[in-house]
Design a protein with these regions (language model features):
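Oxyanion-binding "anion nests"
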Residues: 193, 197, 211, 219, ...
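Extended hydrophobic/aromatic segments used for targeting, binding, or gating
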Residues: 235-255, 260-273, 277-287
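Conserved donor-binding loop and adjoining core beta-sheet/short helix segment
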Residues: 9-12, 19-120, 229, 234-249, ...
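Short amphipathic alpha-helix that is part of the acyltransferase structural core
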Residues: 1-42, 51-55, 60, 157-205, ...
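Active-site/acyl-donor-binding loops of N-acyltransferases
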Residues: 131-150, 223, 252, 276, ...
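Conserved acetyl-CoA-binding loop-helix of GNAT-fold acetyltransferases
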Residues: 90-103, 130, 257, 263-276, ...
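Short loop/turn motifs at secondary-structure junctions and domain boundaries
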Residues: 42-46, 215-220
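Acyl-donor-binding surface of acyltransferase catalytic domains
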Residues: 59, 70, 86-93, 98-176, ...
Length: 325
């Protein structure tokens, strides 16, 4: 017998085991998930989050989460994540979880829901289409195997323009002091992220939330490379995050440049420094994710030797009015 019930904090580990089994390339630790949920609870926007667990004979076999993203927030926009263990699929469990989540968002008056699946998941995308979702964007995981990366071929691209130097965030904190360094880093990220392709407009992220997100164990100040002017302004950035489920892998966060400094090769120069640093520390793989319409970044990653994986297809039901902070 299959039962669907609201999940409790005691179910978090079981739900995470299901998620990690279904999406091993994006596996998380329990600590990471707890940090993420705590960030949602503490966010001043008070984003909604609700989890459900599907059980067969008392065994957890599926999970769903309906939540709101503070970084692209609208009070009527939700995100749905759903996972069912492969050996329990085609039994109506995914449909039951979806129906439970759907009744929940209808009860809350949702006007937009975003959900998706890998293009290789034969059943998931047709299920979304039958329920009124339409494709709005694709995201590619790109993987670089560092054993084939030759830094010597990129020496020219690693040079920065006169008056700009590369420094890690860890070193910038030593130079400027912690508070000044955080402000400089935050100012760059706040502007650079505005033009990142996404399925909804970005909303403002407060400094406190920016810092809180980077208080988790995957953040490494020595893995954040910044381009800094003589005046101390951070004008470009490239982040490398630890992967706690695979210590031989790093994940690229945001690589971006402030608008006035673009088309000078700053982002590439910083990304290359991170790749060299990773190689020196015995890292075997670097992963990044790019939207299908981010053609320049996809082309650059192709040049660097990244290899595209099957796309994640993001789908949308309804549409909320754009909410810009």
């Amino acid at each position: 017998m299959t039962t669907i019930r609201p999940a409790t904090p005691a179910d978090l580990a079981a739900a995470l085991d299901i998620y990690n089994a279904v999406y091993p390339d994006h596996a998380e630790t329990l600590e990471e998930t707890e940090h993420f949920l705590a960030g949602l609870r503490d966010n001043p926007l008070q984003p909604h989050v609700q989890d459900w667990l599907a059980e067969v004979g008392g065994r957890p076999v599926g999970t769903a989460r309906l939540w709101q993203a503070p970084w692209m927030f609208h009070p009527d926009r939700y995100h749905l994540e759903l996972a069912v263990l492969p050996e329990f699929r085609r039994r109506g469990i995914g449909a039951a979880l979806f129906g439970t989540a759907q009744r929940h968002w209808q009860g809350r008056g949702a006007r937009e829901v975003l959900a998706g699946a890998k293009e290789t998941e034969a059943d998931a995308l047709p299920m979304l289409e039958r329920r009124g979702f339409r494709e709005v964007m694709r995201f590619f995981d790109n993987v670089l195997r560092l054993n084939g990366f030759d830094a010597a071929q990129w020496e020219a691209e690693m040079r920065l323009p006169e008056g700009v130097r590369a420094v890690t965030f860890a070193d910038l904190q030593t130079e400027l002091g912690e508070e000044a360094a955080w402000l400089a880093y935050y100012a760059c990220q706040t502007e650079a992220r505005l033009d990142v392709p996404r399925t909804a407009p970005p909303s403002e992220v407060a400094l406190a939330d920016f810092r809180n997100y980077r208080s988790k164990a995957t953040f490494d100040p020595a893995g954040v490379w910044l381009a800094v002017t003589e005046a101390g302004e951070v004008v470009a950035m490239s982040e490398l995050w630890r992967d706690l489920t695979n210590l031989e892998r790093l994940n690229i966060g945001l690589t971006g440049t402030r608008r006035a400094w673009r088309r000078r090769g700053l982002g590439l120069a910083l990304k290359l420094r991170g790749m060299v640093q990773a190689q020196q520390h015995g890292i075997r793989e670097i992963w990044t994710s790019n939207a299908s319409n981010n053609v320049p970044m996809l082309a650059l990653n192709d040049r660097l030797g990244f290899r595209r994986q099957p796309a994640h297809v993001e789908c949308q039901w309804g549409r909320a009015e754009d909410c810009r902070a």
